[in-house]
From Swiss-Prot:
Top EC class for this record: ligase
InterPro entries: Mur-like_cat_sf, Mur_ligase_C, Mur_ligase_C_dom_sf, Mur_ligase_cen, MurD
Catalytically driven reaction(s): UDP-N-acetyl-alpha-D-muramoyl-L-alanine + D-glutamate + ATP = UDP-N-acetyl-alpha-D-muramoyl-L-alanyl-D-glutamate + ADP + phosphate + H(+)
Chief place of localization: cytoplasm
Name the UniProt record assigns to this protein: UDP-N-acetylmuramoylalanine--D-glutamate ligase
Cellular compartment(s): Cytoplasm
One GO biological process term: cell division
Keyword annotations: ATP-binding, Cell cycle, Cell division, Cell shape, Cell wall biogenesis/degradation, Cytoplasm, Ligase, Nucleotide-binding, Peptidoglycan synthesis
Organism: Francisella tularensis subsp. tularensis (strain WY96-3418)
Gene name per UniProt: murD
Family to which the UniProt record says this protein belongs: Belongs to the MurCDEF family.
Length: 416
């Protein structure tokens, strides 16, 4: 066994703040080294008992709110703070593997999953880690050509020395305003990814952030200059917002020097993410769509703008709003939504934004919202679960929320 070094400095004492999946991966990795003491702070009460000055390094889980007491104290020790991805980078930086980081408010999970899928389909060894669910250090023993990392703004705030071969930002819209003072601060946290990337680009055509690439969307298809490359109907994906996701993937692969025509053949096989604008069933002429992964206002706007050209959506909206600005969706509600059923912990908060702009009803929970929506829906209409909120008031996560929705649709079909 060997001692643990970080930036050529021997580390003998480390504090792990937070012990979720990320914290556990750090501790499991450090168990391979000698001469290092790792202390674990699992809650507020434990944290205040540690002398932060006594540690060589402090690793912080992304879920720890640095803007709130008692964790504000960590801001005085910025030089000591490292993320799990910094540690991962220290141990792979001398290999030939390429690292790609993707952040954004909406679409990043689809982009990283599609990128990883295409790389594997082209015959490369690729790993997919980060905010998508698998901590990077869990993959440290694997051999790979490419490492695709989904990063959140919280993770970027913790970066110390990581250098990605390529970083990109997509579709920044207001989110996590319970953790940031305003949208500008949140947006800047995303843009800080550039500081940790050797190559970098932004694709966010909706917010006026410059995109200088060669790909355009014209009438449901992707063009490069004047050459048509791919039509949405040639893919297994639903909604034109996925053309934007494909453009980001093509830009990534372009910058990695890979063959775009071969990549497009792989993209045609990609089935998309669970719980992201997925048609569940058509029951009694009504189409039920699961977009449980729509956990912020921007994601729900993207869904509304992509799935129909008519005012025929019955929308299930609600959960934990995270300070979201629901006035931003009023234009899309007016254009595409027939009725809204609002449920969850922040239903009155959401109501305060959309009251007077659409027909709606408050519900006790998602199940009641679904039952009322299915009763109201007519043939050729759409019942859309796109909550624009986090799910932890009622569910363990967006995946469980989506599964419950799918089960409710299945039960409805059995009764029909």
């Amino acid at each position: 066994m060997f001692s643990f070094y970080f930036n050529d400095n021997k580390i003998t004492k480390l504090l792990m703040v937070g012990y979720g999946s990320t914290g556990k991966s750090v501790c499991d990795f450090l168990a391979n080294f000698i001469d290092i003491t790792v202390d674990i702070s699992q809650n507020d009460d434990e944290f205040v008992n540690y002398d932060l000055n006594s540690y060589d390094l402090i690793t912080v889980s992304p879920g720890i709110p640095l803007n709130k007491s008692p964790y504000r104290a960590l801001t005085k020790f910025k030089d000591k703070i490292v993320s799990d991805i910094d540690i991962f980078y220290q141990y792979i930086k001398d290999t030939k593997a390429k690292t790609i980081a993707v952040t954004g408010s909406n679409g990043k999970s689809t982009v990283v999953t599609m990128t990883d899928f295409v790389l594997k389909d082209l015959g490369y060894k690729s790993i997919l880690v980060g905010n998508i669910g698998t901590p990077a250090l869990n993959k440290i023993g694997e051999k790979f050509d490419y490492c695709v990392v989904e990063v959140s703004s919280f993770q970027i705030n913790l970066f110390n020395c990581v250098r990605f071969d390529l970083g990109c930002i997509i579709n920044v819209s207001p989110d996590h305003l319970d953790r940031y003072q305003n949208f500008e601060q949140y947006k800047q946290s995303k843009l800080n990814l550039a500081k940790f990337s050797n190559d970098f680009f932004v694709y966010d055509v909706h917010n006026g952030i410059k995109y200088a690439g060669e790909y355009q969307i014209i009438r449901g298809a992707i063009y490069r200059n004047s050459t048509k490359l791919l039509d949405i109907v040639e893919t297994k994906l639903f909604g034109e917002h996925n053309l934007e996701n494909i453009i980001v993937v093509l830009n990534i692969l372009d910058r990695l020097g890979l063959d775009i025509n071969q990549a497009i053949a792989s993209i045609k096989k990609f089935k998309g993410l669970e719980h992201r604008c997925k048609i569940v069933k058509k029951v009694n002429g009504t189409t039920y769509i699961n977009d449980s992964k729509g956990t912020n206002v921007g994601a729900t706007i993207a869904a509304l703008n992509s799935i129909t050209n008519s005012k025929n959506i019955i929308l299930l909206l609600g959960g934990v709003a995270k300070g979201g600005d629901f006035s931003l969706m009023i234009k899309s509600l007016d254009k595409y939504v027939k009725y809204v059923y609002i449920y969850g912990a922040d239903k009155e908060y959401i109501e305060s934004y959309i009251k007077g702009y659409c027909k709606y009803q408050l519900c006790n929970n998602m199940k009641q919202a679904f039952e009322l929506a299915s009763q109201k829906a007519n043939s050729n209409e759409i019942v859309l679960l796109s909550p624009a909120c986090a799910s932890f008031d009622e569910f363990s996560g967006y995946a469980q929320r989506g599964e419950v929705f799918q089960n409710l649709v299945a039960q409805l079909e059995q009764k029909s």
